[in-house]
Amino acid sequence: MHLLIAAAGSGSRMGADCNKLLLQIEGEPILKWTLESVALASSIKWIGIIGQPCDKHAIMQIVQDFSKPVQWINGGKTRQESVQKGLAALPDEAIHVLIHDGARCLVEPELFDQCAQMVLKGVAIIAATPVVDTIKTVDSNGYISGTPDRSKLWAAQTPQGFSVEQLKEGHATAIAKNWNVTDDASLFEKLAWPVRILESSPSNIKVTTPFDLSIAQSIIAMKRQS
């Protein structure tokens, strides 16, 4: 299975002056923790890291002794554009692909393997967890306009897995129709293509804010102690 890791984000919401994936948890960069899980996922045979050119040296230093083939891919201005560039850089033999946020450093290796197994069966899949809070929709004036049925709400995560051919078609359509999406499953939704949910752990958070970082630090520290 081929894996693309989105690593082109900034540290703006983290309040950092560098790519948040280079911030450290327990003495190791966030991206290193993500890659440790990738290394233990038996299904993953090739990794493409999509990042900004200014971060290439630092990120390639992290993967210099990695046990699996890693390719650097220059990212775009948005996540959507970065994934497009990642798809274009896949080896010719790639038939299926998993997309993962580099900032989801608490991902379990088994989740990659479970997603890969589903994708190889021809199922588009995303990791997700049921929403536990009551969610409100709000109008432009800040007033509540509705309460969606919580039993139908799931928080999307990564990995997300697809047929390479289908995902490329989805991105090509997005360019033609000027669609802007925040994850790849949204392209499938817009095209009325089915995507299945694979329930994952609520701990598979995307480290985006200082609060997220503190949670990740606590969980990794507890894992080390155990």
UniProtKB/Swiss-Prot annotation:
InterPro entries (UniProt xref): IspD (IPR001228), IspD/TarI (IPR034683), IspD/TarI_cytidylyltransf_bact (IPR050088), ISPD_synthase_CS (IPR018294), Nucleotide-diphossugar_trans (IPR029044)
Top-rank EC class of the record's enzyme: transferase
CDD domains documented for this protein: CDP-ME_synthetase (cd02516)
Catalytic activity: 2-C-methyl-D-erythritol 4-phosphate + CTP + H(+) = 4-CDP-2-C-methyl-D-erythritol + diphosphate
E.C. number: 2.7.7.60
Gene3D superfamilies: Spore Coat Polysaccharide Biosynthesis Protein SpsA, Chain A
Entry similarity comment: Belongs to the IspD/TarI cytidylyltransferase family. IspD subfamily.
Name recorded for this polypeptide: 2-C-methyl-D-erythritol 4-phosphate cytidylyltransferase
Gene label: ispD
